[in-house]
Amino acid sequence: MARTKQTARKSTGGKAPRKQLATKAAAKSAPATGGVKKPHRYRPGTVALREIRRYQKSTELLIRKLPFQRLVREIAQDFKTDLRFQSSAVLALQEASEAYLVGLFEDTNLCAIHAKRVTIMPKDIQLARRIRGERA
């Protein structure tokens, strides 16, 4: 079932207010908490949607530079030892990698939506790659 947007509605009626006796008795028997306030929590999905909007607006790289550079050097080590990289080359690789991943996740999300889900799964990534012709 598709999710629909919830809107606040004014209550038109319901239970009558309780008598004060029950609340006074409960307040006397319960120990004083000293006014400890619960930390504010957003509803599930609110922060995720905010992050989606934030990262769609931004253009900065999302993977940290040094861990990515170590990964590039580790992969390059398998092909040839003692390779040196210009910083601009590593940056170009990172830009291309992030652009590829963003596109893959967009297609993956479309696959999940097509399956009437809102959660992406490994099978969505596999389907997206298969449709693209990257993996048989």
UniProtKB/Swiss-Prot annotation:
Localization terms from the record: Nucleus; Chromosome
Post-translational modification N6-methylated lysine, affected residues: 5, 10, 28, 37, 80
Residue ranges that the Swiss-Prot or TrEMBL entry lists as coiled coil: none
Ranges of Low complexity composition bias in the record: 22-33
Record PTM text: Acetylation is generally linked to gene activation. Methylation at Lys-5 is linked to gene activation. Methylation at Lys-10 is linked to gene repression.
InterPro entries membership: Histone-fold (IPR009072), Histone_H2A/H2B/H3 (IPR007125), Histone_H3/CENP-A (IPR000164)
Pfam families referenced in this protein's UniProt entry, alphabetically: Histone (PF00125)
Predominant location: nucleus
One cellular-component annotation, GO: nucleus
Residues spanning the membrane: none
Protein name stated in the entry: Histone H3
Organism of derivation: Acropora formosa
